[in-house]
Amino acid sequence: MQKLTILGATGSIGASTLKVVEQNPELFSIVALAASTNVEKMVALCRKWQPKYAVMADKAAALALQSELASVSPSTEVLGGVDALCHVSALEEVDSVMAAIVGAAGLLPTMAAVKAGKRVLLANKEALVMSGQLFIDAVEEHGAELLPVDSEHNAIFQCLPQQVQTSLGRCNLEEHGISSILLTGSGGPFRYTDIAELEKVTPAQAIAHPNWSMGPKISVDSATMMNKGLEYIEAKWLFNAAREQLKVIIHPQSVIHSMVQYRDGSVLAQMGEPDMATPIALTMSYPSRVDAGVKPLDVTQVGELTFLQPDFARYPCLKLAIDACYEGQHATTALNAANEVAVDAFLNNRLGFTDIARINESVLNKITASHKSENVNSLESLIELDRMSRTIALEFLRERS
């Protein structure tokens, strides 16, 4: 029986994780559920799952949850704040931690799980984007097991030999005959929209993803392809890939979730229904496979598969992320912070869709002019740079309004 902490239990990844647990009750049990602010959803989850711990990142939300749970799940201990998130990520009785808190907020609890030597099911891409080498070094130092949940990284993982799967972050692709990794992305809902029309895009249009069901932040990132940019940075760290070994391909149907090209001319691809329960189930049961409750892909119904080069004029955020990836850790940390601020402003109708890239670029330029990667060599310095980048992004926002 594998015991789980789920960080981000009220989100879409949390829901898919619980779907896999429900499908395999003899294999998995829930120790702790954690979320940010959604008390109503957390009450429903605690009523159903009766976890030992329920944690809210927001302390006021934790107090509200505590009074709600007194009658429906009295044995559940309610905790609040970032320290509490870190505590349930490092509990001795926990085997695996699903790290699915969106954004920079997920970094500290994910790192706590790593330092406790847990099996870390990594759905929070920002942890690697923000802390890269520090994160990879901590995984090795503390004997944690890192398994990628993101559908693309999970697809790549499945197409790699076992020696690479068990040495993520420090593997040598060339040694194993791998020539390149092809990271696929749908191109989002605006891949055929006239570029001149993009500045009129509304939040409602941007969060309507054609293939995947995701939260609002990730849906907007998919529309700008910043999501693919962050995944590119994550792939660079997970698979220790050089720039020439990592390519982004637009694949509108989202049937192939990514591919690996080998030296002998072979290309291995992972296919499946666009359902996050599949990669989640693999990380939970690796190296075995369990029933994820996902209908099998009917390949006769797929029709044609299309592959295109990304157009950086349409997706400037993707280009910013790829360039930041090889500029250094200071650049990716700053870009991630700026993007979180810009997307939040867009979702709240305070910023235009095409201005997201402009804010991101302005912050990136300002930080790279004053910082180098060697300036960010500790978790504390990364968190300070993240804070500084957000402040600069907010200043640029005020100037625009």
Curated annotation (Swiss-Prot):
Its EC number is 1.1.1.267. Belongs to the DXR family. This is 1-deoxy-D-xylulose 5-phosphate reductoisomerase. Catalyzes the NADPH-dependent rearrangement and reduction of 1-deoxy-D-xylulose-5-phosphate (DXP) to 2-C-methyl-D-erythritol 4-phosphate (MEP). Keywords: Isoprene biosynthesis, Manganese, Metal-binding, NADP, Oxidoreductase. The keyword NADP applies. NADPH binds at T10, G11, S12, I13, N38, N124, E126, G215. Pfam families: DXP_redisom_C, DXP_reductoisom, DXPR_C. The gene is dxr. Pathway: Isoprenoid biosynthesis; isopentenyl diphosphate biosynthesis via DXP pathway; isopentenyl diphosphate from 1-deoxy-D-xylulose 5-phosphate: step 1/6. SUPFAM superfamilies: 1-deoxy-D-xylulose-5-phosphate reductoisomerase, C-terminal domain (SSF69055), Glyceraldehyde-3-phosphate dehydrogenase-like, C-terminal domain (SSF55347), NAD(P)-binding Rossmann-fold domains (SSF51735). InterPro entries: DXP_reductoisomerase, DXP_reductoisomerase_C, DXP_reductoisomerase_N, DXPR_C, DXPR_C_sf, NAD(P)-bd_dom_sf. It is an enzyme of class 1 (oxidoreductase). Mn(2+) binds at D150, E152, E231. GO terms for molecular function: 1-deoxy-D-xylulose-5-phosphate reductoisomerase activity; manganese ion binding; NADPH binding. It comes from the Bacteria. The lineage of its organism: Bacteria, Pseudomonadati, Pseudomonadota, Gammaproteobacteria, Vibrionales. 1-deoxy-D-xylulose 5-phosphate binds at K125, S151, E152, S186, H209, S222, N227, K228, E231. GO terms for biological process: isopentenyl diphosphate biosynthetic process, methylerythritol 4-phosphate pathway involved in terpenoid biosynthetic process.
